[in-house]
Amino acid sequence: MPVEDNIKIPGAPSIERPALDEPTAAREPLSPKPDQQGPEAVSPTGSPTGAPANSRAQSGQYLTTAQGLRLGDTDHSLKAGPRGPILLQDHHLREKITHFDHERIPERVVHARGAGAHGTFRSYGTASKITKAGFLAPDVETPVFVRFSTVLGSRGSADAVRDTRGFSTKFYTDEGTYDLVGNNIPVFFIQDGIKFPDIIHAGKPHPDREIPQAQSAHDTFWDFVSLHTEAQAHTMWNMSDRGIPRSYRTMEGFGVHTFRLVDAAGKTTLVKFHWKPKLGVHSLVWEEAQIINGMDPDFHRRDLADAIESGAYPEWELGIQTFPDTEDQMFEGIDLLDPTKFIPEELAPVQPIGLMTLNANPTNYFAETEQVAFHPGHLVPGIDVTNDPLLQVRLFSYLDTQISRLGGPNFAQIPINRPHAPVNDMLRDGMHQTAVHGGVAPYHPNSLDGGCPFMAGQDVGAFVDVPEEIAAGIKERRNPASFDDHFSQARLFFRSLTPVEQDHVIQAYTFELGKCYEEAIRERQLMALANIDAGLCAAVAKGLGMPAPAATVDTPDAEPSPAVSQIGGKWPVAGRVVGIIADSESDLSLVAAAREAVYAAGMVPLVIAPSGGVLEPEHGPSVTVQRSYLTARSTEFDSIVVAGGGIPAADAIPGRDAKAGEPGVTLDPRVVLMVSEAFRHGKAIGAWGPGAAVLDAAGILQDAPGITSGEGPDTVIPVVRELLSAHRAWERFPAAGSAS
């Protein structure tokens, strides 16, 4: 019996192991896996139904039509004889093919690629001093559904692209549904929502060739942002490591806009929302991201689902920055209505107000993650919007887009979107209406339905629009003068980074602009960089082989904000993946002990061996292999531990693969490549026994930063765990070319 049967390795497709032969005994459908959860069983009008959690799933032992007619065959069409034509009367064929032809709905025009999870939000109560929102009262628990996403790519695009990530949360409160529709970057490309089609058209694939997919390294994107310079601040964040997060679990979230909280007395406070991951904010490195997109395009989806399945539930604290609701809505010289600006945490600390835990995967991607509909206008009493010109347009766009994507105005009745509060809305009929409304008077006022529905007062939780005095002005198309500064916050962000992070920004700009065909676009963007930081501009220009232009704008300086840096802290390692390389030379008792130690630390151990199956010792239990040299790549693992000698697998071709390692060595070149890549990417590496020779073959000094070796897992695994808490061995990243 394999020793790791007690260790849960996530990723099983079903709750039961399949039989070798096709099952023939009739039985009910299998239940969802323990880590899965569907939408709450509530009616289209928000009433709890009391039905089982999976009551909306398929039922019965036998295959039926959509009308419940049992079928005895679904493998053959009805024909006029075995070689004759198919008959039009084949109702099963027509239903099956017709439904298949209409399975797809329009994908989101942005944020098409996403992953979701269920969870709970528990309020600390600290926000109850400034808002009457019931779900923010002390110790209130609220069900949530979260969808993470990329922005530019299509639904089938890769996860680890350089892009902004969406971070949207649906709170099912007893006062109605509240949606916090955010991103992993606190600023946006544009100030006014009328420019949203422009930035997305520029970032999407070129319309003639439909390339490139899910990336900004092309002419149309840089043509737009170099001309429309209010996009420079967001672009700077995107070129940083924030644009390639390690995981959704290690991603910060931001509400982007300034919102207004309202207390019971009507007093208002301006706030910005923040999600702070308990695991810290961590990213990939660019080479690693590129390899991942080829090896595992579903990297972020898989990571989130596997973490939840293995019990390493992701957690974020919700926090707020608070500001006085003054007439000018400015704070420390920064316009709070400008979505291209953020407020450094050193000026306005983030105050935690609650904890979100994601603890269940969806049971059906389409029904939940694809059909969920977020909208920043889904508000509850105590939370209101501001006059941010991007937010104001989103209030229209997010409602409008659901009508085409989800087939009509009744998208709130889709199970994942149903409120957990009573719904009496006087909205009737329409496509896909699933409520069965009673009464004869869906209008107000009425007497025929007894006057119901009645208007609510504040004493029973009515939403009241904040009375706001509008300054005298004229109707015009222009921004306030405070929106004119396009460079100072990009400078603030860049100069707040460590030298290593600055170097990554330089590399990102150099890569992206190097992919642009037109030199004029590269030159124009260099002019923008010159207005941000001369050293940054010079380093990127050098990489492009172009002269560095001089600044044309006198950009004001600001105090750096260390809070935006990702380097320097120590963080939990829950859910991290550790690859353990083993083979016939390994002491399998030590391999088993290593797996136990990794698992006990809350991480996921995966054994990598020359081939799949099991490693069999002369005595004692065997060890199951999760990855072979053929299927493994360093990018799947946060750390690699070498417990074997890298014996070549049967499918190794040294003559072809030697270029990946050191010619002439008696190791499988893919093992050398795996270890070498892990070293290049700053990952923790451990070794014992024959593993030391593998490090030598890869040219890795055993006293290099982030490298540990010892007699066995009892000494190596604790050091690896400590190294992982810093995410990477940052000492391996010399900041060559970083700006001062």
Language-model-detected regions and their locations in the chain:
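Active-site-adjacent core segments of small-molecule enzymes
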Residues: 2-585, 592-600, 604, 609-631, ...
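Catalytic nucleophile loop
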Residues: 518, 639-645, 667-697
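Short glycine-/acidic-enriched loop or helix-start segments at secondary-structure transitions
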Residues: 590, 651-654, 695-698
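Glycine-centered loop/turn motif at secondary-structure junctions
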Residues: 601-603, 682, 699
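Short gly/pro/ser/thr-enriched loop/turn and capping motifs at secondary-structure boundaries
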Residues: 612-615, 693-695, 714-715
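A short, aliphatic-rich alpha-helical micro-motif
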Residues: 634-635
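A charged, well-structured terminal subsegment
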Residues: 704-740
